[in-house]
Amino acid sequence: RHYAAMGHRGLGNGVMLDASTVATATVPHYGDDGQTLTQGMSLGYMLGGMSADSLTGWRFAPWHGAFGHDGSGGRAGMYCPKYDLAIALAKNAHTPSGFALATWSLVVRAIADALGLPVDVD
């Protein structure tokens, strides 16, 4: 519900973020040199569609402009403005940190396939 409320239509009686804040939240922040993308993050959110060599890589979300965050043990959520799509995953067992996004990636791909959405990563 948190990420669904970020959509342009909001959820229930309100919109959590206005369009300008969503636009700002999807702009990658670069290193001190202004050119090196080291983390694939913006405003504390992990960004989708990042290159494989960034900290988050494309594994978080395959769509440019998608943003969200994972949590301890493999829980994650994201919103993709391009497709007005929110996805959340809550697991009932802790996953070791090296594998935290493994299930998430499978879930996101399955949802993309089911909805006929392209996986538009570089």
Regions found by a protein language model. Give the residues of each.
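Catalytic loop of the DD-peptidase/beta-lactamase superfamily, centered on the K-T-G motif
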Residues: 1-122
